[in-house]
Amino acid sequence: QFQSHSVFKNVSLDLRDGYRGVILGGNGSVKSTLLKVISTALVPSTGTVLYSLNQEEIEENARYKHVSFCAPYIDLIEDFTLEEHITFQQKFRPFIAGLSSAEIINRLQLGRFKDRSIKNYSSGMRQRVRLALAIMADSELLLLDEPTSNLDPKGKTWYKELLQEFAGKRSIIAGSNFLDEEFFFAKNTIELKDFQ
């Protein structure tokens, strides 16, 4: 609920291991809000979000360890270099086993910019960093809000290849403005107009 207005209601989702889905809606359709609720970054005014792993509920303060989230509005630390960002993330959310900093930088195709501050990156380069930090993180749930925002055609191909390589068996949900390239992996569709 936002002020006195319900942004969505009667949403009931059961996202099991390996769920692949997309939340579809135009601008202002609250896709981002629903993704934030699923991630537990936002608390719903009514209802609950339950997380379990191996049939045991995950405590609220530990859920962040199991979710990786990418969105164009998520801030990066402007004064950090790419290498510093990767090192910082590893302290609270490790990457998929076997991935070194050098390998992540190589997959990002930003090696010649690795010592440059993020504040000097273009919007497309920043989005690549956000995507790599989320997709290559060791998590059970991957949330992607408008993942191809700010990417040029080459960047969109890179996104698809990276996700195909590192999707694994985890659950993945994208929020999209009906752009097929963002949710090529989806087997399930949620249209927000059904819940408003």
List where the protein language model places each region:
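Catalytic Walker B motif of ABC-type/P-loop ATPase nucleotide-binding domains
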Residues: 142-146
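Conserved ABC transporter NBD signature motif
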Residues: 47-63
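Helix-to-loop junction immediately C-terminal to a conserved catalytic motif
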Residues: 39
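Q-loop/switch helix immediately C-terminal to the Walker
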Residues: 73, 78-94
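Hydrophobic anchor residue at the start of the ABC signature
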Residues: 131
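Conserved ABC ATPase "signature" region
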Residues: 98-114
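Conserved structural motif at the start of ABC-family nucleotide-binding domains
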Residues: 8-10
